[in-house]
Regions:
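Short, structured segments at the rim of ligand-binding sites
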Residues: 1-426
Length: 426
């Protein structure tokens, strides 16, 4: 297995970086642009495994996407709410956004579609979305009995009317339905039953839909009314990935350095910019600019924090916590267990591997700071495990990341960019 050794820095980090485009925004923009009337030009996009999966699937649905990697642009020929292909097999690897968004997109088509993924994808629930589509009149079902992919869709279009969907496992089910709704034959009302996790990702979806001309009304919390009218194609710029930025903010925090991330600001679409607030609670200082955020590392103290709304940065914080002066409790992230791996269990296991005392809870963990010993870090085919645990190696010698290539899912150049940022401090 390939590996990479993380070399500790000798001085506090100081630098500037612009992370690649947001995966969450890129895949949402691809879905919306595919349903739009007329062409869309997407700039600042992310080129990664997850976005390549989406583009390949759209191609199989006969929705062409032109890619210019050098310019970081995608050109999408929108189909005005139609799906040209009347039958397709879509392979989604382990891309949760792809399979969930595409399942709802296919429901707006006319024909038979099948969506599948790798072995881990076959363990990730999709039943709440399938049940919501079935209740709307689409013939949708999971092939297996574990409520996970493969998914079969047989449809003659997405009817209008009322759709209810559970939101306690993932907000992506709701986002998928919302984005497909303008292609329905009549207006759609989507209601969330129970708790909704990761609400900022839903807000991101709504803002992007409005940017492409969708008519949305939210008369009460988690109750959405969407008009049946096509999106309008446009030029749309993708923000840098705020989840990816968390690793560079954290690098400043653990080394006592100063890192400026370009292209993000307080009012960014991505809720994960609030990770900066978590680091400020731990003692860091932050400057919010019009098009940048600067984080200065200061002596860290432990905190008790609910990370439900920014759970994609929980692994990052877990790898900052060992350098604090007291324990850190991360709460309300049980849904992380259904991601690329059981992220709660994986983080606990690997922090214990480096000698730390960590208590696992059903909804999170408590991390007690202590000496970090050399170790080979298992990454569980999870890009965020590899990126998060690289932070330990910036201060502690002997940290080796196994399978660093798993970062190709969302950030292929991560270790190159981290090394460039650290070069002046070694």
């Amino acid at each position: 297995m390939e590996s990479i050794d993380i070399l500790p820095v000798l001085w506090p980090l100081k630098g500037r970086i612009r992370p690649p485009g947001s995966k969450s925004l890129t895949n949402r923009a691809l879905i919306i642009a595919a349903l739009a009337q007329g062409p869309s030009h997407l700039t600042g996009v992310l080129d990664s495994v997850d976005t390549q999966v989406m583009i390949d699937s759209l191609g199989r649905l006969q929705i062409p996407v032109s890619v210019d990697i050098a310019q970081r642009t995608f050109h999408v020929n929108g189909q005005g709410g139609k799906i040209p292909s009347t039958g397709a097999e879509l392979w989604c690897e382990n891309s949760g956004t792809s399979i969930r968004f595409l399942t709802a997109l296919c429901a707006a088509g006319s024909g038979r579609y099948r969506l599948d993924g790798n072995s881990r994808m076959r363990e990730r629930p999709i039943a709440p979305l399938v049940a919501a589509l079935a209740s709307a009149g689409v013939k949708a079902r999971c092939e297996l009995e574990n409520d996970c992919p493969p998914v079969q869709i047989e449809t003659d279009g997405l009817p209008g009317g009322r759709i209810r969907v559970g939101g306690d496992l993932s907000s992506q089910y709701l986002s998928a339905l919302l984005m497909a709704a303008p292609a329905a034959s009549a207006g759609v009302t989507v209601e969330v039953t129970g708790e909704l996790v990761s609400r900022p990702y839903v807000d991101m979806t709504l803002e992007m839909m409005r940017a492409f001309g969708a008519n949305i009304h939210e008369p009460q919390t988690n109750h959405f009314e969407i008009a049946a009218q096509p999106y309008v194609g446009r030029t749309y710029d993708i923000e840098p990935d705020a989840s990816a930025a968390s690793y560079f903010f954290a690098a400043a925090a653990v080394t006592g350095g100063e890192v400026t991330v370009l292209g993000l600001h307080r009012n960014a679409l991505q809720g994960d910019v609030k990770f900066v607030d978590a680091l400020v609670r731990m003692g860091c200082e932050a400057d919010w600019g019009d098009d940048s955020i600067t984080l200065r590392g200061k002596p860290l103290h432990g905190i008790d924090i609910d990370m439900n709304e920014i759970s994609d940065t929980a692994q990052t914080l877990a790898c900052v916590a060992p350098f604090a002066s007291g324990p850190t409790r991360i709460r309300n992230v049980a849904h992380m267990r259904l991601k690329e791996t059981d992220r709660v269990s994986a983080v606990v296991t690997e922090l214990q591997r480096v000698g730390l005392t960590v208590e696992e809870h059903q909804d999170g963990m408590t991390i007690t700071p202590g000496p970090i010993r050399p170790a080979e870090i298992h990454t569980y085919d999870d890009h965020r495990m590899a990126m998060s645990f690289s932070l330990l190696g910036l201060k502690a010698p002997g940290i080796r990341i196994l399978d660093p290539g798993c970062t190709a899912k969302t950030y292929p150049e991560y270790f190159t960019d981290l090394d460039a940022l650290c070069r002046s401090a070694r």
